Swiss-Prot record:
GO cellular component, one term: plasma membrane
Pfam entry (one): K_trans
Matches recorded under InterPro entries: K+_transporter, K_trans_C, K_trans_N, Kup
Parts forming coiled coils: none
Superkingdom of the organism of origin: Bacteria
Predominant localisation class: membrane
Keywords: Cell inner membrane, Cell membrane, Ion transport, Membrane, Potassium, Potassium transport, Symport, Transmembrane, Transmembrane helix, Transport
Localisation: Cell inner membrane
One Gene Ontology molecular-function label: symporter activity
Protein name as catalogued: Probable potassium transport system protein Kup 1
Annotated transmembrane regions: 27-47, 64-84, 115-135, 151-171, 182-202, 225-245, 261-281, 293-313, 351-371, 377-397, 408-428, 430-450
Length: 639
C-alpha cells in the first residue's frame, strides 16, 4: 500500500484512505487479542502476589503507593520504552522474535557467532518453558474467582481448570480460524472492563495517584530492603507477556501493535493497578484478591466468565507462538523435522504441530495438578520470562551495534540501564528457585540441551558423511563416458535430495550400484533455509546444468515458509527445464545411525541425538512429496 503511485492516490483518496484505515483498525483489534492476551491477564494475580511479602505485619499507605508505582514504571520502562519504542523496529523483513533476531545477526556475526547461537537457543528454550506455565497460571487464576461466588466451588477449581485446558489443546488440530475473529473483540472488552473497574475504584483513595511519581518506587525499595527485592519478583508479573509483542511482530506489524498499546492496553492496565491499590488503601482486607473484589457481588460471576475467556485467549496466543517458534527452529536446523499440519486454507500462519501440542498439554496439566493454585504457581513464574528478556537485550545490543551502527557509548548508555533493571528482576525471581522456580529453569535447560544437541550432532553427521563423498562433477564425468560398463539408461526424471550439492548423493550411488540404471534426467536437489522469513518467487531456485542428463537445483525457502518442494518445482518447469512430475521419482537416503564413542560428543548426548533423529518426521511428508513417487534407499552411518 505504501508503494501506490501518486496519481492513483490523487484519483481515489477517500476510498484509498478508507481501505487503509479499515486494515489498520482490523490489525489493531487483532493484535489486542493475540499480542496482549498474556500481559492483559496479569492483573488477576500480580498485585495480590506482590503484596504478600510485605503483608506479614500489615501494609502501610506508603507501601501500597510505592508498590503501585513500581508496577506502573515497570510497564513504562520495560514494555513502553524497550519493546514498543525500540525492539519493534528491530525486525527481520517484518518478523520478530528471538530466533528471527538470531537469524538476522548471523549475517554479520563474525567471531561472535557461537555465542549468539547459544544466547538465541537459551532465549527460545525459555519461551517454550513459559508456554507451559502461562496457560496453567492464567486459567487457574481466572477460575479461582469462583470461590468468591460461593465457597462450595473450592473443590472444583482444579477439575474445571484441567477440563478447560484439555479442551483448549484438543481443538488445536481443528484450527482456531473460526473463533480467532472473536479474540480481539473479547480481549478489547476485557481491557475496557479492567480499566473501568480500576477507574471507579481510584475514587476510593485519590492518594494512589502519587504512584505516578517514580520517587515512591525508589523509596519503597530503599525502605523494604530484602523484602523489596522479593517483591520485585512479583512486580515482574505485571510485564510477563512483553516478549509476545516482539514475537508476534510479523503477524500484525509495528504500527498496529503500538497503537493498541498506547490507545487501550497501557491505559487499561495502569488504571486497573491504580484501582487495586486504591481499594487496598481503603480496605486492607481486600488484599486476599483485590482484582475480583473490585467488582460488586452480582458482577463477580460475569467477571470470572470474562476473565476465563481472556485467559483462554492468552493461552492460545502462547500456544500459537510455541508452534511458530518450533517451526522456525526446525527450518534453521536447531530441531529435527516434525509433522506440521495446516489448519487454514488461506492463512499459512495457522499451523498445528501434534508433537509440540502433546508435550505442552502434558506439561500444563502436570503443573496444575502439582501446584494446585495460582498462588503456588506464580512463584514458579517469572524466571523464564526475565531470562528471555535478558537474552533479548544482549542480542539487541549486538543488533544496534552491527545493524543500526550505534556507537559503543550510545549503545551502552541506552541499553545498560535496561539490562541492569532486568538483571535485578532476574535476581529477584531466582530467589524463588526453591519454591517452584526450579520448574522453568529445568524446562529451559532441557529444551536448550535438545536444541544444542541436534545442532551439534547434525554438524558432526554432515562432516562424517562428507569424508567418503564422491565429488559430483567427477562422478558425472565418469558416468557420461561411453563404455561397455555404462549404466542402462531409463526414461523419466530422477530427483535426488541431498544436503551437499557438491557431492554425489548417497541415494544416487546406491541406486547405481544395486540397480545399474540412470534416468534420462537426473536432478540433484538441495533445500536451503535462508536467514530471512520469506524468499521472493524469483529467488526461489538456482539451476546449474552439469550435462545433458544432470542438473543441480537449489530451492531457497525463508524460515517462516512451508517447504513444499513439489510446488516450488513448478517454478523450475516454467523456466524451460521440462519434466513430467508423474514420471518423476524422488530418491531419498535414509540413514540408520549407529553410536560411536569417538563422535566428539559425550555418550549420553550421542544417544540423545540418535533418539531425536529417529523421531524426525518422514522427509517425504515434510517436503510435501507425492507419496507414490518416493523411493528410499538406506545406509548405516556411525556417529
Amino acid at each position: 500500500m505504501s508503494q501506490i503511485a501518486d496519481k492513483d492516490v490523487a484519483e481515489k483518496p477517500d476510498a484509498d484512505d478508507s481501505h487503509k484505515n479499515k486494515g489498520l483498525y482490523a490489525a489493531i483489534l487483532g493484535s489486542i487479542g493475540v499480542v496482549y492476551g498474556d500481559i492483559g491477564t496479569s492483573p488477576l494475580y500480580a498485585f495480590r502476589e506482590a503484596l504478600k511479602p510485605i503483608a506479614y505485619d500489615g501494609v502501610t499507605r506508603e507501601e501500597v503507593i510505592g508498590l503501585t508505582s513500581l508496577m506502573i514504571w515497570s510497564l513504562t520502562i520495560i514494555v513502553t520504552f524497550k519493546y514498543i519504542t525500540l525492539l519493534l523496529r528491530a525486525d527481520n523483513d517484518g518478523e520478530g522474535g528471538t530466533l528471527s533476531l538470531l537469524a538476522l545477526l548471523m549475517k554479520t556475526a563474525g567471531t561472535h557467532r557461537s555465542v549468539l547461537i547459544v544466547l538465541g537457543l537459551i532465549g527460545a528454550a525459555l519461551f517454550l518453558g513459559d508456554a507451559m506455565i502461562t496457560p496453567a497460571l492464567s486459567v487457574l487464576s481466572a477460575v479461582e474467582g469462583l470461590k468468591l461466588v460461593t465457597p462450595a466451588m473450592d473443590d472444583f477449581i482444579i477439575p474445571i481448570s484441567v477440563c478447560i485446558l484439555i479442551g483448549l489443546f484438543a481443538i488445536q488440530s481443528h484450527g482456531t480460524g473460526t473463533v480467532a475473529k472473536f479474540f480481539g473483540p473479547i480481549t478489547a472488552v476485557w481491557f475496557l472492563v479492567m480499566g473501568g473497574a480500576g477507574l471507579i475504584h481510584i475514587a476510593d483513595d485519590f492518594g494512589i495517584l502519587f504512584a505516578f511519581n517514580p520517587w515512591h518506587a525508589v523509596e519503597f525499595l530503599a525502605n523494604e530492603g530484602f523484602y523489596g527485592v522479593v517483591v520485585l519478583g512479583a512486580v515482574f508479573l505485571t510485564i510477563t507477556g512483553a516478549e509476545a509483542l516482539y514475537a508476534d511482530l510479523g503477524h500484525f506489524g509495528r504500527r498496529p501493535i503500538q497503537w493498541a498499546w498506547f490507545c487501550l492496553v497501557f491505559p487499561a492496565l495502569t488504571l486497573n493497578y491504580l484501582g487495586q491499590g486504591a481499594l487496598v488503601l481503603k480496605d486492607p482486607a481486600a488484599m486476599s484478591n483485590p482484582f475480583y473484589l473490585m467488582f460488586p457481588q452480582w458482577a463477580i460471576l460475569p467477571a470470572v466468565i470474562l476473565a476465563t475467556a481472556a485467559t483462554i485467549i492468552a493461552s492460545q496466543a502462547v500456544i500459537t507462538g510455541a508452534f511458530s517458534l518450533v517451526r522456525q527452529a526446525i527450518h534453521l536446523g536447531y530441531l529435527p523435522r516434525m509433522e506440521i499440519l495446516f489448519t487454514s486454507e488461506t492463512n499459512t500462519g495457522q499451523i498445528y504441530l501434534p508433537a509440540v501440542n502433546t508435550i505442552l498439554l502434558f506439561g500444563v496439566v502436570a503443573l496444575v495438578l502439582t501446584f494446585k493454585s495460582s498462588d503456588a504457581l506464580a512463584t514458579a513464574y517469572g524466571i523464564s520470562v526475565t531470562g528471555a528478556m535478558v537474552v533479548t537485550s544482549l542480542m539487541f545490543f549486538e543488533f544496534v551495534r552491527k545493524r543500526w551502527q550505534w556507537s559503543i557509548w550510545l549503545a551502552l548508555a541506552v541499553l545498560t540501564p535496561l539490562l541492569l533493571l532486568e538483571l535485578i528482576f532476574l535476581g529477584a525471581n531466582l530467589l524463588k528457585i526453591h519454591d517452584g522456580g526450579y520448574v522453568p529453569v529445568l524446562l529451559a535447560i532441557a529444551f536448550t540441551v535438545i536444541m544444542t544437541t541436534w545442532q551439534r550432532g547434525s554438524r558432526i553427521l554432515f562432516a562424517k558423511t562428507r569424508r567418503g563423498d564422491v565429488p559430483l562433477k567427477a562422478f558425472v564425468a565418469s558416468v557420461e563416458k561411453e563404455s561397455a560398463h555404462a549404466p542402462v539408461r531409463v526414461p523419466g526424471t530422477a530427483i535426488f535430495l541431498t544436503g551437499d550439492p557438491e557431492a554425489a548423493p548417497a541415494a544416487l550411488l546406491h541406486n547405481l550400484k544395486h540397480n545399474h540404471v540412470l534416468h534420462d534426467k537426473n536432478v540433484i536437489l538441495t533445500i536451503r533455509t535462508e536467514d530471512q522469513p520469506r524468499v521472493r518467487p524469483e529467488d526461489r531456485y538456482t539451476l546449474t546444468k552439469l550435462s545433458d542428463r544432470f542438473a543441480v537445483v537449489e530451492l531457497h525457502f525463508g524460515f517462516m515458509e512451508t517447504q513444499n518442494v513439489t510446488q516450488a518445482l513448478g517454478y523450475l518447469r516454467r523456466t524451460g527445464y521440462k519434466f513430467d512430475i508423474m514420471s518423476t521419482s524422488f530418491y531419498l537416503g535414509r540413514r540408520k545411525l549407529v553410536p560411536d564413542p569417538k563422535s566428539g560428543m559425550p555418550g549420553w548426548q550421542n544417544r540423545l541425538f540418535i533418539a531425536l533423529a529417529e523421531t524426525a518426521a518422514d522427509p517425504s511428508d515434510y517436503f510435501r512429496l507425492p507419496a507414490n513417487r518416493v523411493v528410499e534407499l538406506g545406509s548405516h552411518v556411525v556417529v
